[in-house]
């Protein structure tokens, strides 16, 4: 049986990296992207920050006001989630193109906007040296097409691949083959094991289990009596680098979209619709290549003041036609145009509620 090979791709400080790419004047500065509550200028929490900001002790989840105290010179920006999602969609398409051909999405698993697993067992022929070459190709393509970096972990399962991607951040690649997994895992603090939170780590410490090696060599009966059969067994297996969990894309959670900049800032409906039609065509092409239908249509506009607005329509049935997509997009765009006095700079369309086609191609009854 061929040796399983899994890649975990983790985009480096994703939101902040996109902002640096879009605004080159930010390079060399501490950049903090905040999920703002709107109550005051910096009320809210840090969504992500670049590595320069991290040198000042700024971390995700921290109140923005505290981050400001740690580095008053940092550049604070609001989250532009719709825009980041559109970038993510393109990156996920790149990653899917490298995954093994699989049925029912069992060779690709997107776990967040900036992370995904892909199985390359057959593409790499079970060879970790070839897997490394494929990993380097992925990094090169993402850099060329999106001007962003990622960190990659390659291992015999999801657990090892996920942990390997954290070993050389940012912009690194780490390969952990089966014969090297103990050398990689065992020296680590047990709190570094993927799936172990603060509460479990504290309990393990109370049991004098400090490293992953300590956990791997600990009596499984005692682990089961402390954590229960399922959790105790999992802890023992994880510390030994055992993980048989499959890759599975959750139906309905994925979205496919495109966003682009208009030739000029405008409120001209024909000009905007012309671009929307092209973007919709690209989206339908991606859907057709994977035999998917959709149920949710979302249009995003970014105005000349760089404010982002989105509206969605949920259809009565899953559909897969460009005409239906455009019909919904036109309606949403008309609403935007009737409400806005500020010209649009960028426009995008995306679809969600994805599922495998079941024969129907066009349903206008929504």
From Swiss-Prot:
Q: Where in the cell is it found?
A: Cytoplasm
Gene Ontology MF: a single term: magnesium ion binding
Recorded protein name is DNA polymerase IV
Q: Which organism is it from?
A: Methanosarcina acetivorans (strain ATCC 35395 / DSM 2834 / JCM 12185 / C2A)
Gene3D superfamilies of this UniProt entry?
3.30.70.270, 3.40.1170.60, 5' to 3' exonuclease, C-terminal subdomain, DNA polymerase, Y-family, little finger domain
- Residues covered by the UmuC domain: 6-197
Q: Which domain of life is it from?
A: Archaea
**Cofactor(s) annotated in UniProt:** Mg(2+)
Cite the cofactor comment. Answer: Binds 2 magnesium ions per subunit.
Keyword Transferase belongs to the record: yes
* Residues annotated as binding Mg(2+): 10, 114
Q: How does it assemble?
A: Monomer.
């Amino acid at each position: 049986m061929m040796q399983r090979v899994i890649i975990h791709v983790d985009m480096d400080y994703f939101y902040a990296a996109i902002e640096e790419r879009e605004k080159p004047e930010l390079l060399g500065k501490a950049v903090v992207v905040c999920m703002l509550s709107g109550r005051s200028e910096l009320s809210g929490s840090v969504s992500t920050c670049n590595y320069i900001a991290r040198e000042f002790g700024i971390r995700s989840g921290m109140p923005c006001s505290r981050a400001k105290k740690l580095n008053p010179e940092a550049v604070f920006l609001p989250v532009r989630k719709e825009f980041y999602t559109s970038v993510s969609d393109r990156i996920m398409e790149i990653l899917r193109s490298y995954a093994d051909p699989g049925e029912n999405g069992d060779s690709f698993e997107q776990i967040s906007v900036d992370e995904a697993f892909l199985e390359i067992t057959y593409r790499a022929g079970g060879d970790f040296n070839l897997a490394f070459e494929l990993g380097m190709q992925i990094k090169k393509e993402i850099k060329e097409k999106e001007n962003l970096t990622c960190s990659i972990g390659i291992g015999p399962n999801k657990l090892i691949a996920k942990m390997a991607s954290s070993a050389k951040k940012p912009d690194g690649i780490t390969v952990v083959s089966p014969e090297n997994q103990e050398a990689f895992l065992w020296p680590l603090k047990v709190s570094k094991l993927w799936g172990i939170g603060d509460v479990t780590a504290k309990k393990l410490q109370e049991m004098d289990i400090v490293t992953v090696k300590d956990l791997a060599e600990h009596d499984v009966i005692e682990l089961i009596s402390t954590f229960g059969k399922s959790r105790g067994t999992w802890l023992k297996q994880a510390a030994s680098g055992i993980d048989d969990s499959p890759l599975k894309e959750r139906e309905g959670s994925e979205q496919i979209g495109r966003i682009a900049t208009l030739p000029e800032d405008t409120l001209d409906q024909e000009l905007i619709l012309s671009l929307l039609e092209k973007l919709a065509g690209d989206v339908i092409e991606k859907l057709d290549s994977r035999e998917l239908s959709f149920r949710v249509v979302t249009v995003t506009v970014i105005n000349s003041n760089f404010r982002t607005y989105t509206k969605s329509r949920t259809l009565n049935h899953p559909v897969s036609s460009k005409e239906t997509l455009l019909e919904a997009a036109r309606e949403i765009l008309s609403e935007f145009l009737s409400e806005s006095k500020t010209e649009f700079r960028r426009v995008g369309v995306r679809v969600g509620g994805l599922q495998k086609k079941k024969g129907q191609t066009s349903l206008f009854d929504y």
